[in-house]
Amino acid sequence: MFMREIELRGHIIDSLILPKVFDKILDMGGDYKVLEFEIGKRKTDPSYAKILVIGRDERHVDEILNELRDLGAEIPEIEEVELQPAEKDMVLPEGFYSTTNHKTFIRFKGKWIEVENQKMDGAIVVYPDEMRAEVKTIRNIKKGDLVVVGHKGVRVIPPEKPREGGGLFEFMKSDASSEKPKETIIRRIAKEMYEIREKYRKTGKGGIVVVGGPAIIHTGAGWALAKLIRMGYVQALFAGNALATHDIESVLYGTSLGVDLKTGKSVPGGHSHHLRAINTIMRAGSIKDAVEQGILKEGVMYECIKNNIPYVLAGSIRDDGPLPDVITDVVKAQEKMRELLKGKDMVLMLSTMLHSIATGNLLPSWVKTICVDINPAVVTKLMDRGTSQALGIVTDVGVFLPMLVEELEKLEKEKEKSEKREE
């Protein structure tokens, strides 16, 4: 991707210059972003527009600019990014540029460089010899790192709604609501997930991360998440001590929080089942050891072990135990989450506000993000904290997951029938 700015001055609206410029850019396979637009108030007042022209590479952009010059476009000089060295470890220069989660480019030595490892609330560090830049968190800053300060030479490209709509993420571009048609939405999510899984199987790239809360187990939908993992629709699992603990409790005792998952009734002594489950895993050594010893024979964590799916169980101050697999150092947990999120195509957040917001803070805005919760305020909080690309589905996760599995099974059966007809 390559970009250049153009400027238009004069009666660019009355003379239809502005729409002609937009049409020409799109007709030549480029894209654009309006950076500034000032409309003249009176008939004699000129208008002004600054537009970012985006193309596949430098040659493509030059071809577009050559055509736009004929329409009156001016090519201004672009300011270079400003850099200052970090004075010591974990200390940023005054006035450092604080990143968003949107795709970002910097102008350095006459070239636009795409910033790597994009996330919100970080700083941009530039490596002149390698002609590259990346986002680093404040705790990873080292003395001497060249940090971007101010806004000069920085371009942010927010995700935009495609001009040709129709997909899931256009259909759902509105506030979270319990009144949206659940079956239609779940069907579209299943189609997206199926396509992502097929791409992952063919290329090893992309994939889906599930962020799960204990409500998955409490509502009796643990089997559905386990099946998603077994079917290949989960490439990483993020959760806390609670989901894993209650998943193991449900396997060993048939309860979650002491409530029988078949009858919905509390069982005698059930209040201690989660502690006994933790104790069993402690005795075994780890969740993996419990699977290998035949103690755990099914469930979400069992499927993660059997299918080599990496998971991050991030600790909390309120945890019982916790399980030996839980990462109690939040910095280490966050680093592992960030590593597993790299290159993923979708994140499915299921009934966990804490872990959903934590994951959202690590995500670039172009990753498809779906948040399922019975409380609409959870989606609102997620978006308020910067994850504006999140699409909210207000429903019980215990209903959502089984329906999702059902839709995915239908898609797989349709594929099998199609392949047999071709034979």
UniProtKB/Swiss-Prot annotation:
EC number, UniProt record: 4.3.1.12
Family: Belongs to the AgrE/ArgZ ornithine cyclodeaminase family.
Key words of the record: Lyase, NAD, Nucleotide-binding
Source species, domain of life: Archaea
Annotated signal sequence range: none
Organism: Methanocaldococcus jannaschii (strain ATCC 43067 / DSM 2661 / JAL-1 / JCM 10045 / NBRC 100440) (Methanococcus jannaschii)
The keyword Lyase is assigned to this record: yes
Enzyme class: lyase
Entry binding sites for NAD(+): 241-242, 320, 352-355, 373, 396-397
Catalytic activity: L-ornithine = L-proline + NH4(+)
Name of protein: Ornithine cyclodeaminase
CDD domains per UniProt: SDH_N_domain
InterPro entries documented for this protein: ArgZ/ArgE-like, ArgZ/ArgE-like_C_1st, ArgZ/ArgE-like_C_2nd, DHS-like_NAD/FAD-binding_dom, LOR/SDH_bifunc_enz_cons_dom
Pfam families assigned to the protein according to its UniProt record, in alphabetical order: ArgZ-like_C_1st, ArgZ-like_C_2nd, Saccharop_dh_N
CC cofactor: NAD(+)
